[in-house]
């Protein structure tokens, strides 16, 4: 039915944008009676094309996912492809719930593709997908994204991440990592912007891991907060030296001061002071599930890494005590700190709160 593919292609390109030669190739196909020229076109632009009354060009009503909050929470939500299938984020995690079942229409057609009067036809109505309610607080999410971006700029950092989680329930109220992504405009998305890195990437935590060592020591009962320990300015093992981040002389610290001063030397010696100290630290890291996946309902969760105990030298134990030579995801660390705030009960971080249509409220494991 297309009478002048070149002219029609140029007319379409003038309205929809893109390369006229691409449209011309589509309009010139001889091996098919149907081809999409543009899917999910803007409604106003489609109306302009319709006014052109082009031969052989027809219009099909379609649906597409809209993201009214744009970038805010975009990484968490994820995005769909042109067929409405979840590709990343919660769109992928809960695709089977959200997508429903597409309808079908089958009919006998003649040589020119026209329906045969009285021919066999079958129609199956579409079934809508379900809604889900998630834990994200959109105002807190926006605030968090702004703060992470500002902090990264102030520190000239290559990236940044942050998590806000309810320690008692595991509901994630806000979570963000640079660079951000707007699911309504994936053409401008940067590499890895579709990943929520506090979930998908492990990192070497550094001094925030000292709380893990301190909790181990307190649970083993080898030191109290006010016990004193001599802490040289530098300690050495296996040909390596360990010192604090700030220069100081030899000093004696209470265990409380070791944490307050964030002393690498102090926490190293405190761990080593336990009977089989490095073994105890290793066992407690395992006990706290710090290198294990949290079970969060988000695709692509990473595990942490910890060398097998048989490979530990003295310097390994020291390094691990202050968060080097070990890797965890930010969410794994948040879960650990959450357990400290939750009387030792560890929860499962999650986004899904309920399924309104069915009234289902999921339950999550605690330990």
Located regions from the model:
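Conserved short loop/turn motifs at secondary-structure junctions
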Residues: 31-37, 162, 270-274
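Extracytoplasmic
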Residues: 7, 32, 54, 71-73, ...
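Short N-terminal helix-loop-first-beta-strand/juxtamembrane motif that initiates sensory/input modules
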Residues: 55-59, 153-167
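Solvent-exposed, polar/charged alpha-helical surfaces in well-ordered, non-transmembrane soluble domains
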Residues: 6-14, 21, 47, 51, ...
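Conserved, well-ordered alpha-helix/loop/beta-strand core segments that scaffold catalytic motifs
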Residues: 34, 117-160
């Amino acid at each position: 039915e297309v009478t002048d593919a070149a002219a029609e292609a140029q007319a379409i390109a003038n309205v929809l944008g893109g390369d006229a030669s691409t449209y011309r190739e589509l309009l010139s196909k001889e091996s098919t009676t149907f081809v999409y020229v543009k899917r999910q076109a803007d409604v106003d632009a489609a109306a302009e094309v319709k006014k052109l009354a082009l031969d052989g060009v027809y219009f099909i009503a379609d649906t597409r996912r809209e993201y009214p909050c744009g970038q805010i929470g975009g990484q968490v939500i994820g995005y769909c492809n042109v067929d409405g299938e979840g590709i990343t984020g919660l769109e992928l995690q809960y695709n089977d719930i959200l997508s429903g079942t597409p309808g079908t229409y089958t009919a006998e057609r003649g040589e020119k593709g026209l329906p045969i009067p009285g021919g066999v036809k079958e129609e199956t109505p579409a079934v809508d997908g379900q809604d889900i309610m998630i834990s994200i607080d959109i105002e807190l999410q926006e605030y968090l994204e702004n703060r992470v971006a500002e902090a990264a700029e102030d520190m000239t950092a290559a990236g940044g991440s942050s998590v806000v989680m309810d320690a008692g329930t595991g509901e994630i109220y806000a979570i963000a990592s640079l660079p951000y992504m707007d699911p309504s405009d994936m053409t401008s998305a940067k590499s890895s912007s579709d990943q929520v890195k506090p979930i998908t990437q492990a990192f070497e935590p550094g001094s925030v891991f000292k709380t893990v060592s301190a909790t181990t020591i307190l649970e083993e009962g080898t030191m109290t907060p006010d016990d004193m320990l001599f802490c040289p300015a530098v300690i050495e093992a296996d040909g390596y030296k360990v010192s604090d981040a700030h220069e100081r002389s030899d000093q004696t610290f209470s265990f409380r001061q070791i944490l307050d001063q964030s002393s690498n030397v102090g926490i190293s010696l405190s761990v080593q002071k336990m009977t089989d100290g490095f073994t105890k630290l290793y066992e407690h890291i395992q006990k706290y599930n710090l290198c294990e996946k949290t079970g969060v309902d988000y695709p692509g969760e990473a595990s942490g890494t910890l060398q097998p105990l048989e490979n530990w030298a003295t310097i390994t134990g020291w390094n691990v005590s202050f968060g080097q030579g070990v890797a965890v995801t930010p969410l794994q660390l948040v879960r650990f700190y959450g357990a400290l705030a939750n009387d030792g009960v560890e929860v499962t971080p999650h986004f899904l709160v309920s399924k309104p249509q069915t009234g289902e409220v999921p339950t999550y494991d605690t330990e």
